[in-house]
């Protein structure tokens, strides 16, 4: 009888030990699986884009409004806007409080006081060489000048795109353009640019390297010249060095957070660099030119539409630059 009881107790103990071992084995296996699963999630999460179902509540000073779920916040609630204008606009308005007035008007379009900055420039040529663009979104007002239509389109090309430039010593060296993004930019009070293409023996093609009068004239008496020649061919260059400078530049890509508003003029300027593409006229606004107050009122009215086709502090090489006319 006692032998049967001891056997029963021993069987129960063995069962408990075996069950405990099975449970520990299952626990260790689950820990291993969960650890590997979490590790996999941690590794792939930076490469996965998913919908954010959180609530985005921008701080505007008051939260007594209903906000809908969105993955992208309203740009004018969280961003800064710089408006660049010619000094003549400020002189014509002649009102010490005009910027404050415009700030109040921008407030009606959703731009908080202090988020819009007004900056004037004396000369658009100087401004375009190295534009100081400080804000998330930058809008440049450029007055149309019928005496320099070509210069205006090239100025827009400088402002709307980012360039990397180096000085050129045309008295010592030949130069060639390596790609369609490689241009020679000349600027000064009077720029006349002449070029002589060279063959592989550095002899002039249709010109004499020793006689600048035989060079081809690509620009005459202009303030700004963006010279585009045949790629991969050496050129001897001649410019009026006393009144003009020249630089070898590469276009890095568009400044997507910059737009230009052309003020006045009968036609919108086309700044398309590639003649095989459709002209960039689909993003142009136009109104009749009257006075600078009228210009600024129109800018306030349309500013949010302009912002929607720009990118905040971005410089993607795949997107187009933007040019507007009012």
Curated annotation (Swiss-Prot):
N-glycosylated. The N-terminus is blocked possibly by pyroglutamic acid. It comes from the Viruses. Residues 1-50 form the signal peptide. It is found in: Virion; Host endoplasmic reticulum lumen. GO terms for cellular component: host cell endoplasmic reticulum lumen; T=13 icosahedral viral capsid; viral outer capsid. Disulfide bonds join 82-135, 165-249, 191-244, 196-207. Homotrimer; disulfide-linked. 2 Ca(2+) ions bound at each subunit interface in the trimer hold the trimer together. Interacts with the intermediate capsid protein VP6. Interacts with the outer capsid protein VP5*. Some rotavirus strains are neuraminidase-sensitive and require sialic acid to attach to the cell surface. Some rotavirus strains are integrin-dependent. Some rotavirus strains depend on ganglioside for their entry into the host cell. Hsp70 also seems to be involved in the entry of some strains. In group A rotaviruses, VP7 defines the G serotype. This is Outer capsid glycoprotein VP7. It comes from Rotavirus A (strain RVA/Human/Venezuela/HN126/1983/G2P[X]) (RV-A).
């Amino acid at each position: 009888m006692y032998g049967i009881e001891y056997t029963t107790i021993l069987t129960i103990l063995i069962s408990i030990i075996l069950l405990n071992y099975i449970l520990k084995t299952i626990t260790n296996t689950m820990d291993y699986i969960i650890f590997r699963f979490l590790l996999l999630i941690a590794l792939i999460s930076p490469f996965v884009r998913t919908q954010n179902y959180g609530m985005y509540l921008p701080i505007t000073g008051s939260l007594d409004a209903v906000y809908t779920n969105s993955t992208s916040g309203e740009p004018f609630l969280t961003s800064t806007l710089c408006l660049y204008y010619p000094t003549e606009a400020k002189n014509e308005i002649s009102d010490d409080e005009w910027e404050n007035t415009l700030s109040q008007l921008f407030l009606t379009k959703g731009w908080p006081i202090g988020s819009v900055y007004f900056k004037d420039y004396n000369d658009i040529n100087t401004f375009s060489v190295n534009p100081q663009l400080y804000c998330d979104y930058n809008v440049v007002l450029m007055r149309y000048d019928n005496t320099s239509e070509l210069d205006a389109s090239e100025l827009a090309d400088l402002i709307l795109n980012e360039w990397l430039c180096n000085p050129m010593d045309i008295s010592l060296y030949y130069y060639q353009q390596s790609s369609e993004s490689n241009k020679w930019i000349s600027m000064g009070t009077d720029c006349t640019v002449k070029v002589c293409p060279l063959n592989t023996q550095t002899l002039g093609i249709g010109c004499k390297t020793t006689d600048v009068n035989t060079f081809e004239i690509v620009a005459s008496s202009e303030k700004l010249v963006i010279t585009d020649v045949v790629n991969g061919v050496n050129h001897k260059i001649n410019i009026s060095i006393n009144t003009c400078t020249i630089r070898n530049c590469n276009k890095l890509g568009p400044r997507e957070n910059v737009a230009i508003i052309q003020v006045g003029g009968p036609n919108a300027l086309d700044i398309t660099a590639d003649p095989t593409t459709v002209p960039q006229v689909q993003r142009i606004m136009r109104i009749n030119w009257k006075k600078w107050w009228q210009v600024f009122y129109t800018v306030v009215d349309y500013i949010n539409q302009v912002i929607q086709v720009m990118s905040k502090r971005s410089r993607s090489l795949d997107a187009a630059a933007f040019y507007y006319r009012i």
